[in-house]
Amino acid sequence: MVPDENDDASDDQSSQLSGLLDQLHTLVEVLADIEEEGGHRHESGRIDRGNARIDYDYDVSIGLGRADGSSYDEEPSSNRSRSEQRSGQQRTTEDSIHVETRGGTSGDELVVVADLPGVTDDDVDVALDTDEQALTLRVDDDVVERVVLDRPDVAITDMTLRNQVLEIRLARTSDTDGGEST
């Protein structure tokens, strides 16, 4: 039987195979570049496209060793103290924290949103200083952000940490616009 010249199935299979091999080749080249850089690559940044903003932070290691950066002759991270485990993460955390203030659903509500990579409930502490009109955010007893508030008479009404994103809701404590209590 003579192959049908109109049959493109063999062309599709060869182009798919070629595309897969090209992707595999690119992956091997990137891994070789990381190997030349000492087996570790870490980058972070921000991409703004129109109304969208994307913050990214990645850490890639290849070769022998643990994901936390310790070698196999060091004690496992589960045997190290919590502060020792956090010290390596803290540099990354402080560099990649992003805090944003927004208006809430009601006119008297203010929402502070903080992206806190690698942070758990036990690590976070928030303090409201009404004299200074500021909200202080601490991670492991270190001040990582201080948000100056434009409203003198606010109180924290809700605080949640989900997927390493902290949301703090503040509301006015009085009905006046001037900030004076009646």
UniProtKB/Swiss-Prot annotation:
The organism of origin for this protein: Halobacterium salinarum (strain ATCC 700922 / JCM 11081 / NRC-1)
- Which family does the record claim for this protein? Belongs to the gas vesicle GvpH family.
UniProt function note: Proteins GvpF to GvpM might be involved in nucleating gas vesicle formation. May be important for the stability of gas vesicles. Gas vesicles are hollow, gas filled proteinaceous nanostructures found in several microbial planktonic microorganisms. They allow positioning of halobacteria at the optimal depth for growth in the poorly aerated, shallow brine pools of their habitat. Expression of a 9.5 kb p-vac DNA fragment containing 2 divergently transcribed regions (gvpD-gvpE-gvpF-gvpG-gvpH-gvpI-gvpJ-gvpK-gvpL-gvpM and gvpA-gvpC-gvpN-gvpO) allows H.volcanii to produce gas vesicles. A similar region restores gas vesicle production in H.halobium without the p-vac locus, but it still has the c-vac locus.
Name the gene behind this protein: gvpH11
Cite the record's Acidic residues compositional bias ranges: 1-11
**Locations of Low complexity compositional bias?**
12-21
Note, other: Encoded in a 14-gene plasmid locus called p-vac which produces predominantly short, spindle-shaped gas vesicles during all stages of growth.
Record region (Disordered): 1-21, 65-106
**What is the designated name of this protein?**
Gas vesicle protein H1
Question: What does induction of this protein depend on?
Answer: Part of a gvpF1-gvpG1-gvpH1-gvpI1-gvpJ1-gvpK1-gvpL1-gvpM1 operon, maximally expressed in early to mid log phase. Gas vesicles appear earlier when grown in static culture, possibly due to O(2)-limitation.
Annotated Gene Ontology cellular components are:
cytoplasm; gas vesicle
Q: Where is the composition biased (Basic and acidic residues)?
A: 92-101
Q: Which domain of life is it from?
A: Archaea
Cellular localisation? Cytoplasm; Gas vesicle
What InterPro entries has UniProt attached to this entry?
A: GvpH
Description of how the protein assembles with itself and partners: GvpF to GvpM interact with each other in vitro, and may form multi-subunit complex(es). Interacts with GvpC1. Might interact with GvpA1.
